[in-house]
Amino acid sequence: MLAVPTEGFENGVSFEGYALFVFNIGPRDEVKDNVWTYVGSILTGDDNAAACDGGDVMPCATRSGKLGFAAQTGSDMPRLTVTPSGTMITGPGKTRQLGAADTVTYVYDAATKKYAEK
């Protein structure tokens, strides 16, 4: 698996994550067949500093996440986890600290051939 860092910006929020690819093993026509296959994207962090105006418009919140890989029983594809840190907005004028309880797990869905949140 290859996890390529990605980042973007939309509506005053910068975000970061990974685009996920797997290498196609076995015989193939490299002219017609993809050597790498896209299997999804995951978000690992965001920052609303450009939209929050120092907390005057909305609470400022920044989070980042650590990407982890683990073997998954019954699958050749690893289980992915994103363990966040930082803060998130929970309501008007409110934020809270993120921790291990906020960890998000992603598993490969063979039907869609993409990673999905579990």
Features from the language model and the residues they span:
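Acidic, small-residue rich beta-repeat scaffolds with periodic aromatic anchors
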Residues: 17, 22-118
